[in-house]
Amino acid sequence: MCIRDSGIRVNVTLIFSQSQAILAAKAGAKYVSPFVGRVDDNSFGGLCLVKDIAKVFREHMVSTEVLAASLRGVRDVGRAFEYGADIVTMPTKVFEGMYNHILTDKGLDQFDKDYAESISGV
């Protein structure tokens, strides 16, 4: 019996190679989680691993989704999606870094000033 046949949506975590992801998908996992940061810590190419897994899943029409984990920077998030990740996980500081931007802050300050001037009759 395949895991998927039981109705349980399984995430196989601690994926460090394309072959591990393929085995998990063949066993019926709904998600595989390559640990990008940990791969980078021990070699290089954590995001390339995401790309390689997503590519083989697409080519073979595998329905298992790629959940890129252990992302450590804002750029990692964008690249993970660019390389085919379906889902990402990240620390709060990375999430906050995604929506915080100096130009956004400056723009909001200017909007506030413009609004204040418009209602004060200046």
Sequence positions of predicted segments:
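Short, small-residue-biased leader/transition segments that mark boundaries at the very start
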Residues: 1-2
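Short, well-ordered coil/turn segments that N-cap beta-strands
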Residues: 6-8, 28-30, 62-65, 86
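Catalytic beta/alpha-barrel core
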Residues: 8-22, 33-43, 66-70
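Glycine-rich phosphate-binding active-site loops on the catalytic face of alpha/beta enzymes
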Residues: 14, 30-42, 85-104
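Catalytic cores of alpha/beta
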Residues: 17-27, 72-86
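Generic structural signal for well-ordered alpha-helices
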Residues: 21, 50-54, 77-78, 108
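Short loop-to-alpha-helix "cap/lid" segments that border enzyme active sites
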Residues: 44-60
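C-terminal helical cap(s) of enzyme catalytic domains, especially alpha/beta-barrels
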Residues: 50, 97-121
